[in-house]
C-alpha cells in the first residue's frame, strides 16, 4: 500500500470501523507522517481488547513501515472512531465497550455496552503513542461516533441512547419518549483534558442543565456542516431523517432551532459527511434508474444536499447519484479534494485514506 507525497500538512480521517489517518510534517526527514489504525487483539483470550498500531509514511514513495513500540492498548474494548486534532499532538480514541452476551459492541437498551470510554493519547518522538492517564466518559449509553470541530476546541460524542428518557420531550417536542444524545466536551489545548459542556438551553425536571443534547432515537451518524451539527437517525422500518443543532464555535454550545426531524425518504442510510460545501448521505438501498431508456440497478445511492436556513438540507441540482454497481453494503463516504468516494468496509478492514490539503492523493481505495 502506498501514499503519494504529501508535503507539509497535518490531516486526520476517522471513520466507522476505527480508522485514523494522521499526517504530520517532518522537514528534512524520510518520514512525512504517521498513520494509526485501531483494532482488536487477535488473541482468543483478549479478542475484544482494543489496540492501536502505527506506521511511518515514507517521504518519497509513501511506503509504510511499522513504528517500533506499537501496537499499544487503546484503553478499552472494541475501539471505534478516533480523532487526531489538527495542529495538535493529541489523539482521542472512542472505545465502544462490550455487551454481556458475546463481547461485541453490538449493544441495545437491554444489552448495553459496559466499559465504554474515551482514551487520550499524546504523539511523541518517532510517532510513539503514550496514554495520558486520562479517561473520559460520554453522558449517554452505547457511544458510537465522535469528532472534533475544525479548530480543535471541542469534541463531540454521539450516544445511541440518552441516559434519561424523560429529557427527550424537553428538546425534541411533546410525546417523544426515547432518544439518543450528543455529549460535548471542551478541549484543553495544553493538556488535552476534556471538560463537559452542559446544555444551556434545556434543563431537567429538577431545574438543572442537561449534561447532554438530545437527538432523535436510533442515531446513525453525525456531522459538522457550516454552523450546524446534523444528526442522521432512523431505522429501515421508520425511515431516515436528519436533525440539526445550531453550533457555536465560541462556546461549543448546541441550540435547538426546530423540534422536528427532516425526513429524507430513504430507509437504510449508513453515513453522513460534509465536503466542498455540501452534505452527502450514503443510502445502502437497492433501487432502479434509467439511462438512455435502459433500466439499471444500483446497490446504493449517494445523496447530495446543501445546508439551508435552520440547518435544513436542500437537495443539490445533481440530486442522487447511484453507487458503484460492484459495491454492496457500503457504510461510509470519504471526501477527496475534488470528489466524494464511496467506501465499502468488509469485516476486519480498518484502513483507508482520503484527502489532503495541497496536492491531491492520486490513488484511492474503493471496494
Report the location of each language-model feature:
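Predominantly soluble domains enriched in secretory-pathway, periplasmic, or organellar proteins
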Residues: 23-367
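Sec-dependent bacterial lipoprotein signal peptides
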Residues: 1-26
Amino acid at each position: 500500500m502506498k501514499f503519494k507525497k504529501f508535503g507539509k500538512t497535518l490531516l486526520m480521517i476517522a471513520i466507522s470501523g476505527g480508522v485514523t489517518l494522521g499526517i504530520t510534517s517532518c522537514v528534512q526527514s524520510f518520514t512525512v507522517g504517521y498513520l494509526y489504525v485501531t483494532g482488536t487483539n487477535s488473541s482468543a483470550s483478549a479478542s475484544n481488547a482494543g489496540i492501536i498500531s502505527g506506521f511511518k509514511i515514507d517521504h518519497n514513495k509513501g511506503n509504510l513501515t511499522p513504528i517500533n513500540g506499537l501496537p499499544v492498548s487503546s484503553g478499552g474494548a472494541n475501539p471505534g472512531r478516533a480523532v487526531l486534532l489538527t495542529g495538535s499532538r493529541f489523539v482521542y480514541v472512542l472505545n465502544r465497550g462490550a455487551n454481556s452476551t458475546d463481547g461485541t459492541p453490538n449493544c441495545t437498551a437491554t444489552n448495553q455496552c459496559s466499559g465504554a470510554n474515551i482514551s487520550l493519547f499524546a504523539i511523541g518522538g518517532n510517532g510513539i503513542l503514550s496514554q495520558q492517564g486520562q479517561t473520559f466518559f460520554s453522558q449517554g449509553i452505547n457511544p458510537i461516533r465522535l469528532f472534533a470541530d475544525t479548530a480543535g476546541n471541542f469534541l463531540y460524542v454521539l450516544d445511541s441512547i440518552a441516559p434519561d428518557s424523560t429529557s427527550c420531550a424537553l428538546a425534541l417536542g411533546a410525546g417523544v419518549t426515547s432518544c439518543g444524545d450528543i455529549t460535548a466536551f471542551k478541549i484543553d489545548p495544553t493538556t488535552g483534558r476534556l471538560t463537559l459542556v452542559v446544555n444551556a438551553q434545556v434543563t431537567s425536571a429538577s431545574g438543572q442543565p442537561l449534561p447532554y443534547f438530545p437527538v432523535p432515537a436510533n442515531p446513525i451518524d453525525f456531522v459538522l456542516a457550516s454552523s450546524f451539527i446534523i444528526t442522521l437517525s432512523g431505522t429501515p422500518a421508520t425511515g431516515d431523517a436528519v436533525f440539526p443543532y445550531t453550533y457555536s464555535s465560541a462556546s461549543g454550545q448546541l441550540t435547538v432551532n426546530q423540534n422536528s426531524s427532516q425526513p429524507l425518504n430513504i430507509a437504510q442510510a449508513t453515513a453522513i459527511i460534509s465536503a466542498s460545501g455540501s452534505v452527502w448521505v450514503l443510502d445502502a438501498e437497492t433501487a432502479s434508474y434509467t439511462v438512455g431508456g435502459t433500466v439499471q440497478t444500483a446497490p446504493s445511492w449517494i445523496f447530495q444536499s446543501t445546508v439551508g436556513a435552520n440547518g435544513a438540507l436542500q437537495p443539490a441540482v445533481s440530486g442522487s447519484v447511484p453507487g458503484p454497481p460492484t459495491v454492496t453494503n457500503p457504510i461510509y463516504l470519504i471526501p477527496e479534494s475534488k470528489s466524494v468516494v464511496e467506501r465499502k468496509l468488509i469485516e476486519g478492514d480498518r484502513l483507508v485514506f482520503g484527502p489532503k490539503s495541497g496536492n491531491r492523493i492520486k490513488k484511492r481505495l474503493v471496494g
